[in-house]
């Protein structure tokens, strides 16, 4: 997987997903369930806004002092027997991990869920070496078996599939013969993966939070697969975005409380694991060799700029669960491994406007994402700023839109042209007007009216109305 997950046109992806009634109902149910649970848990926590402000302060502080905490983290990892590699690009990160796999003659690698490894397309890089890479998160495993489908949700990657579809995938690909009952499906995957953990040469994880003061990494999971990935293989590789740091355990506790409640509405996940370095003498499990790969891949270019707040993100998907656009089109429409409002903001920054210039328009700018964010990222404002950059700096607005805006500029700056245009507007739009609205407009208005009605021009202009009003006042 890489940042870009589809080469199809954005409009074609939207049309396809809008016709997928199962996906839309599945996403709606999941959003409602997550939202209800989140509200219940945040209310139990107390003053939620105070918690949000505290989380925002922590994330802002880290970003403003990121160089210091990165140095502290790397120093403490090294003191505990680990190796640290700073990867400026995705290619540098994958090359470093490929080198580890070559040195270990790795035939089998087990992975826990990690968005950053999908961002850098790590699985494909390792498979090029002939390594068998096995996803151990249940949702990611389902998608891997289903011909490497991209995830449709940051937290629940297989959200778009129901139990019958999952059963059919396992039946077609692996000869599964049991029912579609969730407990039977889960037990089947558990038995399939058990031997994989025991025979894997390398374990690879992501990182929810790295703790600078101790050189530890924290993994927040519900399935326990990440614990096995880190406990059984002799070599462990952890891949993290450079911004995923907290200063101490105290800040980690705050952010974990925000994360678990915002993601799926839990007080705590089933497993919160903190790992520090290689195993000590006498330990029965843990890696003999540990590598921490810290990935930049465009993040340093975001630091210090107007989009820096997006690096506060803790990957909870609360914004996704609140988004009305995601509710209707699902995750695959975005064409990026990052979907929802997070993907709308982050994908153009990491992947470029050439591939993701449509995403900032996949938003109503309603602000629901901003209200849901546990660390107060002003998501809808960042999305709006993307639109401004696309038009003003990147010059990527459609030709028809550029011509329309140029014509409007000429007309608005000339009193004579403006007067003529207002007189002509009503009769020109009359064939398209129905009950004072334009429901199917011509030319540049066509795209607009596909999604909403356009108000019809008034037959009586303001100037004409004012002229007659003033004349009437004078006569009276």
Curated annotation (Swiss-Prot):
Residues 304-334, 353-382 form the 4Fe-4S ferredoxin-type domain. It comes from the Bacteria. Keywords: 4Fe-4S, Electron transport, Iron, Iron-sulfur, Metal-binding, Repeat, Transport. Pfam families: Fer4_8 (PF13183), LUD_dom (PF02589), LutB_C (PF11870). The gene is lutB. Belongs to the LutB/YkgF family. GO terms for molecular function: 4 iron, 4 sulfur cluster binding; metal ion binding. Is involved in L-lactate degradation and allows cells to grow with lactate as the sole carbon source. Has probably a role as an electron transporter during oxidation of L-lactate. One of its GO terms (biological process) is lactate metabolic process. InterPro entries: 4Fe4S_Fe-S-bd (IPR017896), 4Fe4S_Fe_S_CS (IPR017900), FTHF_cligase-like_sf (IPR024185), Helical_ferredxn (IPR009051), LUD_dom (IPR003741), LutB (IPR022825), LutB/LldF (IPR004452), LutB_C (IPR024569). This is Lactate utilization protein B. Residues 452-476 are annotated as: Disordered. [4Fe-4S] cluster 1 binds at residues 313, 316, 319, 373. NCBIfam families: LutB/LldF family L-lactate oxidation iron-sulfur protein (TIGR00273). [4Fe-4S] cluster 2 binds at residues 323, 366, 369.
């Amino acid at each position: 997987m890489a940042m870009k997950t589809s080469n199809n046109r954005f409009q074609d992806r939207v049309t396809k997903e809008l016709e997928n009634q199962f996906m839309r109902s599945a996403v709606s149910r999941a959003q409602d369930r997550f939202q209800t649970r989140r509200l219940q848990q945040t209310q139990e926590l107390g003053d939620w806004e105070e918690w949000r402000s505290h989380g925002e302060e922590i994330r802002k502080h880290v970003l403003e002092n990121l160089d210091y905490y990165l140095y502290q983290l790397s120093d403490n990892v090294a003191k505990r027997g680990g190796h640290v590699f700073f990867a400026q690009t995705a290619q540098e990160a994958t090359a470093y991990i490929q080198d580890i796999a070559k040195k270990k003659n790795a035939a089998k690698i087990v992975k826990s869920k990690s968005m950053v490894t999908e961002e850098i397309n790590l699985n494909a890089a390792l498979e090029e070496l002939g390594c068998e890479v096995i996803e151990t998160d249940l949702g990611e495993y389902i998608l891997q078996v289903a011909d490497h489908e991209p995830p449709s949700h940051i937290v629940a990657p297989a959200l778009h599939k129901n139990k019958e579809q999952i059963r059919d995938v396992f039946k077609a690909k692996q000869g599964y013969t049991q029912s579609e009952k969730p407990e039977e499906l889960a037990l089947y995957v558990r038995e399939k993966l058990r031997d994989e953990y025991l025979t894997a040469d390398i374990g690879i994880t992501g990182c929810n939070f790295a703790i600078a003061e101790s050189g530890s990494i924290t993994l927040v999971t519900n399935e326990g697969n990440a614990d096995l990935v880190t406990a059984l293989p002799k070599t462990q590789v952890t891949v993290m975005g450079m911004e995923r740091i907290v200063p101490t355990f105290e800040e980690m506790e705050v952010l974990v409380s925000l994360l678990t409640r915002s993601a799926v509405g839990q007080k705590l996940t089933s497993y919160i694991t903190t790992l520090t370095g290689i195993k000590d003498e006498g330990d029965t499990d843990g890696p003999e060799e540990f590598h921490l790969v810290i990935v930049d891949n465009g993040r340093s270019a975001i630091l210090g700029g107007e989009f820096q707040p997006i690096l506060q993100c803790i990957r909870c998907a609360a914004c996704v669960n609140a988004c009305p656009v995601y509710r209707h089109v699902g995750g695959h429409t975005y064409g990026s491994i990052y979907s929802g409002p997070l993907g709308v903001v982050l994908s153009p920054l990491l992947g470029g406007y050439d591939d993701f210039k449509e995403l900032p328009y996949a938003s109503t700018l309603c602000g629901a994402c901003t209200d849901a964010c546990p660390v107060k990222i002003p998501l809808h404002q960042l999305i709006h700023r993307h639109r401004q950059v696309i038009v003003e700096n990147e010059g990527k607005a459609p030709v028809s839109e550029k011509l329309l805006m140029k014509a409007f500029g000429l007309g608005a700056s000339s009193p004579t042209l403006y007067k003529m245009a207002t007189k002509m507007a009503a009769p020109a739009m009359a064939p398209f007007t129905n009950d004072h609205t334009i429901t199917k407009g011509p030319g540049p208005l066509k795209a607009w009216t596909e999604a909403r009605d356009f108000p019809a021009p008034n037959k009586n202009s303001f100037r004409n109305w004012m002229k007659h009003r003033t004349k009437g006042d004078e006569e009276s």
